[in-house]
């Protein structure tokens, strides 16, 4: 339980209303009750302040809180992160390795690493300080994981990539002799699969964040600070430029190189390399303005087709 004043101090915000009001939970604005604090900085939530049962609101404008208790902040999402952390049950992580974990004797794991039950850590794996590995994670031989990473349940890192050559209808497996290197401050969502490299390491650079069920094929390189949404598949030897954003179920083809700060809309299919600093959408993925022009052409064709049918019908 915290007072509104304590919360305001934590987020460097300004109290509006009663600073001594007691806050016991953080809730959605539609479900908030007495004792709740909620977030109302988006326009669609500002209109719900008057009908909400919350005791306090976090917003970016003092005008929103006339007659209500709340905290005004300059950066609402940073305040949201801080407040959720204050009320999180997991804020005090106990660093430990569960006894049901299987760890190779040759693995090098820093003392303050946390590993959950039924995880498997292979030969010569390196895991650096502050990293948390949840339950049922498999980390294959030679994988390197940097500091302060979070690996969610069900992740498999370092399994063989999908590489075959076919001669006379027989498939010959290509050996994968490299591994996976993960930088610092990386988060990998549940049930992601990251294949090891064949001739070079699969690499995820610092501060990348991956949603659930993302697949990285062999030899992939993910630049620093990328955000990758769920269901995305990145083909072998592809390179994603730093600080790029990939929406849900994006497909990146093998050997494709994307420039820095690219944005790919959900379900984009990227079949060839593209420059950075632009937004892409569609299948095949095109720069968004080009795609919109093409879509407009098809719309006009449909309109003309309907007119033509109407004229033909009238002639009959």
Annotate each language-model stretch with its function.
Residues 1-100, 143, 148, 154-155, ...:
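Terminal amphipathic alpha-helical/low-complexity segments used for targeting or macromolecular assembly
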Residues 39, 96-287, 292:
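Structural signal for interior beta-strand "rungs" in well-ordered beta-sheet cores
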